[in-house]
């Protein structure tokens, strides 16, 4: 078991961050559909990625890494914040610290916040499944916003390979607040 404490800027975790940033928030749901295409987020592979947390614990034998306390992932204008992030990876002899880990799933919990320019998302939980190419934001209330346009539900599922997205309700309707002035800016 390996433990690291703040500050943490781990270049070997670049794949984790790129996947998190790309999958986590690709845009906002269009019009009044609960199923829609999401605009792809533009990330540069040549931009540095920084991860910091109060503590990092790597358990290579279990193929798990735990980032806990004030987790912050930044690449360019995209920022992910959460109370904790758990990374599951696979591959015999692979190691997160050497950069050869094959990421299987990533879980983020405790006040998940994503911000990319004018686009923002908040949730209680997030899950990335690399094999299924899906990302799910869930919780008591998932809020997506772009400028004054706001979409609220309890579960957002994004198919990373197609950009398809579905926002599900909390037992009642999915709520959408659209600002007609935002259409004129685009």
Model-identified regions with their sequence ranges:
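Mature-chain termini and adjacent capping regions
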Residues: 1-186
């Amino acid at each position: 078991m390996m433990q690291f404490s703040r500050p943490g800027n781990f270049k070997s975790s670049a794949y984790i961050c790129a996947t998190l940033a790309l999958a986590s928030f690709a845009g906002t749901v269009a019009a009044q559909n609960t199923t829609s295409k999401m605009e792809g987020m533009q990330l540069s592979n040549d931009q540095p990625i920084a991860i910091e947390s109060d503590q990092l614990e790597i358990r290579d034998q279990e193929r798990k890494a735990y980032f806990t306390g004030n987790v912050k992932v930044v690449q360019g204008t995209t920022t992910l914040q959460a109370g904790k992030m758990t990374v599951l990876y696979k591959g015999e002899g692979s190691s997160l610290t050497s950069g050869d880990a094959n990421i299987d799933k990533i879980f983020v919990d405790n006040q998940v916040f994503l911000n990319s320019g004018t686009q923002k998302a908040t949730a209680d939980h997030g899950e990335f499944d690399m094999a299924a190419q899906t990302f799910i934001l869930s919780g008591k209330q998932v809020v997506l916003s772009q400028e004054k346009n706001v979409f609220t539900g309890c579960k957002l599922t994004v198919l990373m390979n197609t950009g398809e997205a579905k926002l599900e309700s909390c037992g009642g309707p999915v709520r959408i607040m659209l600002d007609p002035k935002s259409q004129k800016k685009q």
